[in-house]
Amino acid sequence: MARAVGIDLGTTNSVIAVLEGGEPTVIPNAEGSRTTPSVVAFAKNGEVLVGEVAKRQAVTNAERTIRSVKRHMGTNWTIDIDGKKYTPQEISARILMKLKRDAEAYLGEQISDAVITVPAYFNDAQRQATKEAGQIAGLNVLRIINEPTAAALAYGLDKGEKEQTILVFDLGGGTFDVSLLEIGEGIVEVKATSGDTHLGGDDWDQRIVDHLVTTFKNQHGIDLSKDKMAMQRLKEAAERAKIELSSAMETTINLPYITASSEGPLHLEVKLTRSEFQRMTADLLERCKGPFNQAIKDAGITVNQIDHVILVGGSTRMPAVVDLVRELTGGKEPNKGVNPDEVVAVGACLQAGVLKGEVKDVLLLDVTPLSLGIETKGGVFTKLIERNTTIPTRRSEIFTTAEDNQPSVQIQVYQGEREIAAYNKKLGMFELTGLPPAPRGVPQIEVTFDIDANGIVHVSAKDLATGKEQSMTITGGSALPKEEIERMMRDAEAHAEEDRRRREEAEARNQADTLIYQTEKFLRENADKVPAAEKANVETAIANLKKAMEGSDVTAIRSATEQLATESQKLGAAMYAATQAAAGGSSGSATGATGSASGSAGKDDEVVDAEIVDEGEK
């Protein structure tokens, strides 16, 4: 049975984990790192770069480098590269393909099944988009689970039978979630969740970038925000400074040759203290309080009832965030035994193990983060499923017509907490037609909402008089038609094929280069010993291989390489034969010399027959 993996598809970094002998193991990528930057770049030569290599070239290729694409999931955002529009799903799929490829190389086997995590506060469109990204990457997405739930699963499985209340405070690169869970006797139950899908470490970085731009403008009168290459350098420097300020009280941001004026090159050097940084990001920290209080209220508990606090996401390493959590939880010390970067992927792979039957006696009960309902007369949002309802779930309600002889009803589906439908997130709409003429208020239309374990919504409407039914799986917002997903999968496969061809070409060229170098070196060093005929053949083969390398036909390069290898072997054989022949003549005289030596030895018997006699035998 193929193994299933758990993937934390993050805004800034992504992680993949697998169960090895029942124990979760984080899989290092091809570069040897346990986290992979969620960065995708399209090189000028058409090559698609993912991870660390994409991040490294971002400064010189800013316009064709995409980072933090998770923030665009579930929207109509696209990026145009060489006349082709890419959706957030396609860009995310590149990251997933890199994780999948590296994991397959590490494990030595194919991977098809995966559990992928999303922020708890992701709406339906964002979840659907994540599932589609997995499909485009060639993965069978077993389940979409919430990041805080995965973290609690990773933390709580070995904590025994005692029931505990756990708070997961998850501040990642681009999203923020707070979840309250109860863990005990193998059951992980989410009681409440709240969050902000547009708050994360990126926002802290941006404050430093804004500060640097303002400082530089005041000093030199030049606005760096107009220079894409400079902005890319500022972003990287801001991220480094933020990380440094988690352990140091002060850091210096030093960027030589950031731009140039009429007088010559200009350099940026700015000192930033931790207190300054905390001052300029105080409002971001303040935004964390709302979702925290909401989750506590929805769970119907007090902070005193929280047994453990788990910090998830790299941004929770900031001292100000740790202090805030301590303050909000009444002085509780956050758990230090959890790696905030890896715990989500570990939980995801445990859930994959549960679904595959490898992990026994574990039940995961998750919730829907936002209320679901439809628009009714007057633009009112009528909720059918309240937020924090345990999923999977199914709810039905009877509605009627607003006009006499109404031939059809339009069902508009929304997700959110506002009383007026238009202020919530519209997930989609469909129409139930063919209603028989009747006065208003008479027809009975049953609307049913069904949320599966992935948190993805299915809606149906049925006229109870005629039995006519209309249903839909919500594909509003960003969700892609099936044909579009299939096209993107083909594209992704074609790119994988293209990457494989590029790799093969590079390997063939390296092999050819090495052989040419070694052969030419051999010819130079043995110029006086090489037979003329074989030398001419080898030189012709070298010329043919160099000509083949001017093109990009891998078969031609390989064929010419083989030809040169064959001619080199013939040359070696000819040289060996010539050396043997020469050695044969000289070995005859050597034998004569040996014969005379033994002859002379025969004349002196004392030397040959001498024996060592033990003193005791005399």
Swiss-Prot record:
Biased composition (Acidic residues): 606-618
Region Disordered, residue ranges: 492-513, 579-618
Biased composition (Low complexity): 579-601
Phosphothreonine modification, residue list: T175
Induction behaviour: By stress conditions e.g. heat shock.
Family indicated by similarity: Belongs to the heat shock protein 70 family.
Functional description taken from the UniProt entry: Acts as a chaperone.
Protein name (database record): Chaperone protein DnaK
Organism annotation: Acidothermus cellulolyticus (strain ATCC 43068 / DSM 8971 / 11B)
Gene name as annotated: dnaK
